């Protein structure tokens, strides 16, 4: 933000960037849900031997009630009951006010920032032991369900990969061509080294310097804008992660025989979109927020164990899609805000 200098320009760029990221994330989740419901990856898995006594399925609500419930009535109660949408909205509201207050709220802002860093460090420490836990969970799952679950898991992977491909090579490139008239094939050729680096590292944060340099040297995008937009995208733009979450919700819901209503699908789109805001660009972070997406529509979080074992490969693909979305957004902003 310091690189842009002019606060008026900063505000315009910031608003356009965030709106683009939120819009493409909502589209990404919609694509994921559509692909998953078309392929039905969880159909055919039997779970008669899996105990569901601890599974709580949320009572279905009308769409209007779902939208009204986004507004937090009591943030403390929402935290206590793990009602994720009001919590996210309240957190966003607090963050906006802290940003508006500036230095006057620096102590509170620093506390939340450091507390978030602490939680992320704690989470990543736990994630280091995840392979052992995942092995045990998968072993138990296959003991109950059987190895017939391999085919649905491959279908799940296929759904995620197909949705990622649609988002990256259709949605992004269509937006790029319509608003900038850039040749999508030339764009992909020039940006491919960054996509490849993101794929191998599975972290958006590590690609920030390479993205900025590539966009500047090969695509002629101003560093003044890219130095603000790209780091913001590494935190806010998680289209690939949202796609995984959309497919995972349908996959696990079908395994447990849960029918999601239209209002549930809208809730998934809203929750996954809002959950992407503030998500760190580190490997497999999408699994951390996946639980809140499941909880928002009453899908059992136990189902996450099924997909954790194959998530690393998909995480690499998701990261490549995420940073491509950042670059497309920056190209659009560059055209509308020439510097």
Locate each region found by the language model.
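Signature of multi-pass transmembrane helix bundles
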Residues: 8, 16-188
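Juxtamembrane helix-boundary/capping and inter-helix hinge elements in multi-pass membrane proteins
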Residues: 2-9, 44, 101-106, 114-117, ...
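Helix-loop-helix junctions within the multi-pass membrane cores of secondary transporters/permeases
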Residues: 194-276, 330
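Residue-level detector of conserved catalytic or cofactor/ligand-binding positions
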Residues: 331-339
């Amino acid at each position: 933000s310091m690189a842009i200098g002019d606060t008026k320009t900063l505000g315009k760029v910031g608003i356009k960037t965030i709106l683009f990221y939120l819009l493409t994330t909502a589209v990404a989740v919609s694509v994921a849900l559509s692909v998953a419901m078309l392929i039905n990856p969880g159909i055919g898995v039997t779970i008669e031997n899996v105990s569901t006594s601890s599974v709580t399925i949320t009572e279905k609500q009308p769409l209007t009630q779902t939208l009204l419930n986004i507004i937090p009535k009591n943030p403390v109660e929402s935290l206590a009951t793990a009602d994720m949408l009001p919590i996210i909205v309240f957190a966003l509201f607090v963050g906006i006010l802290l940003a508006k207050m500036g230095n006057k709220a620096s102590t509170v802002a620093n506390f939340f920032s450091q507390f978030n860093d602490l939680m992320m460090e704690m989470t990543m420490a736990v994630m280091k032991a995840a392979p052992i836990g995942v092995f045990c969970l998968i072993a138990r799952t296959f003991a109950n369900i059987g190895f017939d679950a391999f085919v649905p898991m491959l279908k799940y992977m296929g759904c995620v990969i197909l949705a990622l491909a649609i988002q990256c090579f259709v949605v992004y490139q269509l937006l790029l061509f319509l608003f900038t008239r850039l040749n999508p094939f030339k764009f992909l050729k020039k940006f491919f080294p960054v996509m490849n680096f993101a794929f191998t590292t599975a972290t958006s944060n590590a690609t920030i310097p390479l993205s900025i340099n590539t966009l500047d040297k090969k695509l002629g995008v101003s560093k003044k804008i890219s130095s603000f937009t790209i780091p913001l995208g590494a935190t806010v733009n998680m289209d690939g992660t949202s796609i995984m979450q959309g497919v995972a919700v349908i996959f696990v819901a079908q395994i447990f025989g849960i029918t999601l209503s239209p209002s549930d699908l809208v809730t998934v789109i809203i929750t996954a979109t809002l959950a992407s805001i503030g998500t760190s660009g580190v490997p497999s972070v999408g699994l951390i927020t996946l639980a809140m997406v499941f909880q928002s529509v009453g899908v059992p979080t136990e189902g996450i164990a099924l997909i954790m074992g194959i998530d690393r490969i998909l995480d690499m693909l998701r990261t490549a899609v995420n940073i491509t979305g950042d670059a497309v957004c920056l190209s659009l902003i560059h055209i509308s805000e020439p510097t």
